């Protein structure tokens, strides 16, 4: 037990944690040089392309330290992006230590702070590491100063390394062994193992990644999952080094995988405790994780109606690997049958869409993302509205509408403060705090979540040339003057185009959307009226002019009444068409709503 060290690597996006993980695996001989590839632990294509880590991965390594002992190191790689912070907290709760990787040329950024606080809350020993010291722009002393100022942990003896060249990586491991405590636990006690992650494998069913806290788990054991009460027979246990290696048993302090012939992921909940069947059952489950609540909702619809079942199966399969994705069936008059999906944030939403399109070949229409509003009705009931179409139709019944407010922490170099403050003000933010740390400035704002999901992140990156970083957490619901803007096409409401916006901004948004629709909707044989309305008040209107055939082409000279007759006849025909015709709304129209703000 004394020779085991469980640790994870936390850092801001692009500070080099996956590269450092690669070097550590190479140094410990986890993979031969031939099998070594960049970002070994990022196994999804999307992860490699975008250069981000989404799912936490593990590797059990053995390292011969300078004191001559061989240590078993369990590395758990974590994502750095704010949307996946729940993955980080899960990984950290299985560890005793964390390497806090800071890019020596960039200094401390938003996720560095957020993840580090998560680690400290969970009682994990944080070991600061300065990466990228080979860069000409590296300024390790300044980075150390920032770590101490902003996060408040002692970083005077922070290890310096370069994951790219490999220098200093051995020192990182030595610091890790010296500072991180060995796991506590009793291999002879009743079994308690925490499920850190679970995913679906086509051959063996559900694979669970567990951290054994007490007891010993062997193949052929009968185990009980405490949350569901279901019993299973363990078929195989083992560790990842990063390839899977079967072992006879996993004992207290170890991290490894368990395969028990479970068919669906619902049965193996992340955060659940595995124990033996009575009489050797553990008294109580381990404290799990808090359930993640989706923050952003959007409708996903198949482009072709007959793909609905396929979409449902794809979502079920995705949910096998992504416990935080939530979805329920939904019907829209404009788009037919589809699903209302809940995501952790915008990046999560993009990734789910991309995985559906890539891994399952789905063609999707996505509606504008919305957040959950609470509507207080006159009769005292509270309604949750996560879809603009569900907003109560009669405004006189509504007492108040509450919108979610988030606390946003922003970090940026001094010269961009003005631009960022202007952006936050535009987004109805109120400033809570502002502090200077060397050349970095930290701003704290309270901003409505609805403004963040539109395009806050993209705009923040563009006004700060990519230097600002942010992370946000939910604070509370507040009463707000928001209204629902409906889009009518030829007098018919298109439910999928409805948006909920603040009243001060509603006329502008209505006009913008109507103008955008006019560009996108193809011309028909009759005039198409596009209107934006709040309740019964139309706030904007655009017309798509009709295409017409020149019916007078065959008339040369002659009497005016002949021409009039032909024109009247054409007018009649157009009128009849307008009564029976329906307007096809192209896919771009639904995306246009998202892009209205960007001009």
Curated annotation (Swiss-Prot):
Enzyme class, broadest EC rank: hydrolase
Cysteines paired by S-S bonds: none
GO molecular function: GTP binding; GTPase activity; guanosine tetraphosphate binding; ribosome binding; translation elongation factor activity
Catalytic reaction annotation: GTP + H2O = GDP + phosphate + H(+)
Family, similarity comment: Belongs to the TRAFAC class translation factor GTPase superfamily. Classic translation factor GTPase family. LepA subfamily.
One BP term from GO: positive regulation of translation
InterPro entries: EF-4, EFG_III/V, EFG_V-like, EFTu-like_2, G_TR_CS, LepA_C_sf, LepA_CTD, LepA_IV
Function of the molecule: Required for accurate and efficient protein synthesis under certain stress conditions. May act as a fidelity factor of the translation reaction, by catalyzing a one-codon backward translocation of tRNAs on improperly translocated ribosomes. Back-translocation proceeds from a post-translocation (POST) complex to a pre-translocation (PRE) complex, thus giving elongation factor G a second chance to translocate the tRNAs correctly. Binds to ribosomes in a GTP-dependent manner.
EC number: 3.6.5.n1
Primary location: membrane
The name this protein goes by in its record: Elongation factor 4
Domain tr-type G: 2-184
SMART domains, per the entry: EFG_C
A Pfam short name: GTP_EFTU
GO cellular component: plasma membrane
Residues noted as binding GTP in the record, renumbered to the chain: 14-19, 131-134
UniProt topology in membrane: Peripheral membrane protein
Subcellular location: Cell inner membrane
This protein's UniProt keywords: Cell inner membrane, Cell membrane, GTP-binding, Hydrolase, Membrane, Nucleotide-binding, Protein biosynthesis
Species annotation: Ralstonia pickettii (strain 12J)
């Amino acid at each position: 037990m004394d020779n085991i060290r469980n640790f994870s690597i936390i850092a801001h996006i692009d500070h080099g944690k996956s590269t450092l993980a690669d070097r550590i695996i190479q140094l410990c001989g986890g993979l031969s040089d031939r099998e070594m590839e960049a970002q070994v632990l990022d196994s999804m294509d999307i992860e490699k392309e975008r250069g981000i880590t989404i799912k936490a991965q593990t590797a059990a390594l053995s390292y011969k330290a300078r004191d001559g002992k061989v240590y078993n190191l369990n590395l758990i790689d974590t994502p750095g992006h704010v949307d996946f912070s729940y993955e980080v907290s899960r990984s950290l709760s299985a560890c005793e230590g964390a390497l806090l990787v800071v890019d020596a040329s960039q200094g401390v950024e938003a996720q560095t702070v957020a993840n580090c606080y998560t680690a400290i809350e969970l009682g994990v020993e944080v070991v600061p590491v300065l990466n990228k010291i080979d860069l000409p722009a590296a300024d390790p002393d300044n980075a150390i100063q920032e770590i101490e100022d902003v996060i408040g942990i002692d970083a005077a003896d922070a290890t310096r390394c370069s994951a790219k060249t490999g220098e200093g990586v051995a020192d990182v491991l030595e610091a890790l062994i010296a500072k991180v405590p060995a796991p506590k636990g009793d291999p002879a006690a009743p079994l308690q193992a925490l499920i850190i992650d679970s995913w679906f494998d086509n051959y063996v069913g559900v694979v669970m990644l567990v951290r054994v806290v007490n007891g010993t788990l062997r193949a052929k054991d009968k185990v009980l999952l405490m949350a569901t009460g279901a019993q299973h027979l363990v078929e195989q246990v083992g560790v990842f080094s990063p390839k899977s290696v079967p072992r006879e048993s996993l004992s207290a302090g170890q991290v490894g995988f368990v395969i028990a012939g479970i068919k669906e992921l619902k049965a193996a909940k992340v955060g659940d405790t595995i124990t033996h069947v009575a009489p050797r059952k553990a008294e109580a489950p381990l404290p799990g994780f808090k359930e993640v609540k989706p923050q952003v909702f959007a409708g996903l619809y198949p482009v072709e109606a007959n793909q609905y079942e396929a979409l449902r199966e794809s979502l079920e399969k995705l949910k096998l690997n992504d416990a935080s994705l939530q979805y329920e069936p939904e019907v829209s008059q404009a788009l037919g049958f589809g699903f209302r999906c809940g995501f952790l944030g915008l990046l999560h939403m993009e990734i789910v869409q991309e995985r559906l399109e890539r891994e399952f070949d789905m063609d999707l229409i996505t509606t504008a993302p919305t957040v959950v509003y609470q509507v207080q009705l006159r009769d005292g009931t509270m309604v949750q509205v996560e879809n603009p179409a569900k907003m109560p139709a009669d405004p006189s019944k509504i007492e108040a509408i509450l919108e979610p407010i988030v606390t946003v922490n922003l970090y940026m170099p001094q010269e961009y403060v003005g631009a960022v403050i202007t952006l936050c003000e535009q987004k109805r933010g109120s400033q809570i705090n502002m502090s200077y740390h060397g050349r970095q400035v930290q701003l704290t704002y309270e901003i409505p979540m609805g403004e963040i999901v539109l395009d806050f992140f993209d705009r923040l990156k563009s006004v700060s040339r990519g230097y600002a970083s942010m992370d946000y957490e939910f604070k509370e619901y507040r009463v707000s003057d928001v209204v629902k803007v409906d889009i009518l096409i030829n007098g018919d409401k298109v439910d999928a185009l409805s948006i909920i916006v603040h009243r001060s901004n509603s006329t502008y948004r209505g006009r913008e959307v109507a103008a955008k629709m006019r560009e996108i909707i193809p011309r028909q044989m009759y005039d198409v009226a596009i209107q934006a309305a709040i309740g019964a008040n139309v706030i904007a209107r655009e017309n798509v002019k009709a295409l017409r055939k020149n019916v007078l082409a065959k008339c040369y000279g002659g009497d005016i009444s002949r021409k009039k007759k032909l024109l009247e006849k054409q007018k009649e025909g157009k009128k009849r068409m307008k009564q029976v015709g329906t307007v096809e709304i192209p896919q771009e129209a639904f995306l246009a709503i998202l892009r209205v703000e960007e001009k």
